[in-house]
Amino acid sequence: MAKNEHTLKLEHHVFEPQRHSGLPDIVMLHGICAGAWVFPKAFLEPLLDQGCRVHTLSYRGHGESEGRGRIHDWRLSDYVSDVVSILNALSEPAIVVGHSLGSAIAQVLIRDACPLAAVVLLSPVPPKGLSTIALRMLWSDPIAYQQLAIAFTVGVHQVSGRVAARLLFSKTDVTDDVRQFMSQCCDESPWLALDLQGFSRIAPLKYDPRRMPPVVIVSGDDDRLIRPSDATESAQLYQTDVHWVGGGSHMLMYDQGANSVSQWIGHQLKQVLQ
């Protein structure tokens, strides 16, 4: 367990490779209602096999971290502080891999000039926030919009399993793995829904590759939440291309080809850090 500046104990796991490649440590940042558990060992193993030391953590109020009783008080800035407390304890700037909410936190770190070796954005929140996505969903998929509102207010365990399967896993049926995933989820701070809208910008206004870390973007072309146009918006800001995962859902770590995705990430990081 690590501690943040409020002395809350944070769940923090370190996975060591059999042989180190010399790459900086990789710190995985999870999405909403999740925790360190959301990155399956099968997704991490290709990175370990390539010689990377990998960290997973849970923000305050998530997973095994303290602060669950105040989950409705926490803001995006609190989760950023938790991540910074982990990064500051490392001996050198790390590689940050952020999924969904974690990608928003990673972009805040870039904006705030936090020392980083590289950043990987998975199923990325657009630089301008989720307001455009929320409006699109309100008009094109009002049931999904309603269910997301329920997740942030009534609680994630009141969300329709069928809607969760469709939005997160691009599935039409509620399978056992979807049920297992949802059973592990925790409630989320309603403030986060506001913080992620983008009224206060989460990303740098302009990306300067000369003084900012290299950015890698990975997104599924069948993501029902972060559409291809949203991922492309991120790529335009960070002056890069999207690595499209064919048939990939929002939860890339759980797709059939998840290990191929993490293997590609490891190879790509070696290239951008050469």
Regions found by a protein language model. Give the residues of each.
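Short beta-strand/loop motif that positions the catalytic acidic residue
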Residues: 211, 217-219
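Conserved alpha/beta-hydrolase
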Residues: 47-68
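Conserved acidic catalytic loop of the alpha/beta-hydrolase fold
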Residues: 78-94
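Conserved alpha/beta-hydrolase "acid-adjacent" motif
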Residues: 224-230
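Flexible "cap/lid" loop of the alpha/beta hydrolase fold
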Residues: 115, 119-150, 192-199
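Active-site glycine-rich loops that stabilize anionic/oxyanionic intermediates
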Residues: 31-35, 100, 221
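Catalytic histidine-centered segment of alpha/beta-hydrolase-like enzymes
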Residues: 248-260
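The serine-hydrolase catalytic nucleophile loop
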Residues: 32-44
